[in-house]
Amino acid sequence: GPPCCLYGSCRPFPGCYNALCCRK
């Protein structure tokens, strides 16, 4: 599936959300 994080921002996908992605 697609990565949870793209371009340094929080990008949730269906069934793939990681709060750690929100870190800069």
UniProtKB/Swiss-Prot annotation:
Tissue spec: Expressed by the venom duct.
Keywords: Acetylcholine receptor inhibiting toxin, Amidation, Disulfide bond, Hydroxylation, Ion channel impairing toxin, Neurotoxin, Postsynaptic neurotoxin, Secreted, Toxin
Modified residues (Lysine amide): 24
Domain of life: Eukaryota
Keyword Cell membrane: no
Disulfide bonds: 4-16, 5-21, 10-22
Gene Ontology molecular function, alphabetical: acetylcholine receptor inhibitor activity; ion channel regulator activity; toxin activity
Modified sites of kind 4-hydroxyproline: 2-3, 14
Subcellular location: Secreted
GO cellular component: extracellular region; host cell postsynaptic membrane
Family membership: Belongs to the conotoxin M superfamily.
Domain notes: The cysteine framework is III (CC-C-C-CC).
Function (record text): Psi-conotoxins act on postsynaptic membranes, and act as non-competitive antagonist of nicotinic acetylcholine receptors (nAChR). Is less toxic than Psi-conotoxin PIIIE.
Protein's name according to its UniProt entry: Psi-conotoxin PIIIF
Organism, scientific name: Conus purpurascens
